[in-house]
């Protein structure tokens, strides 16, 4: 190190007001990369790229960082303990101090690594919300500001049900349409409903009616609901900030998949009329139109509970996959053993319900989930003992991830509540004047 006072045997590090004296020999191989970089500095400019300020007279290097965090880090690199978070300090702030001085998250103790992972997972949702809700550059011009504010009002009205009174009314109307559509869809499958509809049509029109919407009161209600959802989707697309992001959202994809079959059936009715092509397509169209049941997922846009469930499943997908693997392994073992004990050992008095391993898999799933339909059950003593072990194993396996999923659900709920309150405050501040 050629910069600084050549005769000084030590240097002074001033970190947030706390002064530490180090010998020059220690700088070259010092465990903290930022401190060791001082050894190679040749000019004051090089020094200021490493630290925040430098006092030539005192040979003192000033770092505008957290002094308490540096004290913990310095004790760790000197071998006087294990690296843990400083008390009364945010985990992310301490982690930023570690990155600044040249340490990685792996240097933390395992318990602190878990706390850091949890905190980083907590903030991931807020970073995504801030990225999506970040304001676009304000356009210039005499009419730019009113136009932008009007589009922003419309977007908040359609995207944030709690942002204003108009948004709450619009959300309530949308929920009513979803419920009405679901009720009509379910009622249309009742035998009495279909019989009453058949009495109002001629025998020749029955097959055609199954693929042609709009001929009965249920069809009229369906057309009104489709019209509302179509208009809502179009308006939301027009006022959205990012059109590509709008198309990629799962709820919008569900809207498109639920609306499209209706228009396909209408177009086929118009262009094919009464020929056999429409009759052959009737089954396909009925399957597609049954996708309207997914409209119930639209309620997630208006109810924070469904949003919490979706976010919890997204965060806990690793635990879900792990649980699925456990169940599959247990199902393979118990189904093979039950088939052997109930059918494979004694063919004369064998249990026909366990004639194959795939057939036994159904019994294993029902037993592990403690449902117990009773449609098939073991009759031999070894088979019943195996059934008891299967039930107990299922209870244990299903209970393993419950605690983690519960805490994740509560955490996601509080996050979404906080985000909703933050959006409401930002809306009031933006449109108050």
Curated annotation (Swiss-Prot):
For this protein, the parts annotated as crossing the membrane are 166-187, 218-239, 251-271, 282-302, 318-339, 385-413
Which named protein is this? Voltage-gated potassium channel regulatory subunit KCNG3
| Keywords carried by this UniProt record | Cell membrane, Cytoplasm, Ion channel, Ion transport, Membrane, Potassium, Potassium channel, Potassium transport, Transmembrane, Transmembrane helix, Transport, Voltage-gated channel
Q: How does it assemble?
A: Heterotetramer with KCNB1. Does not form homomultimers.
Q: Which family does it belong to?
A: Belongs to the potassium channel family. G (TC 1.A.1.2) subfamily. Kv6.3/KCNG3 sub-subfamily.
**Native source organism of the sequence:** Rattus norvegicus (Rat)
Intramembrane: 358-369, 370-377
Which loops or segments lie on the Cytoplasmic side of the membrane, by the record? 1-165, 240-250, 303-317, 414-433
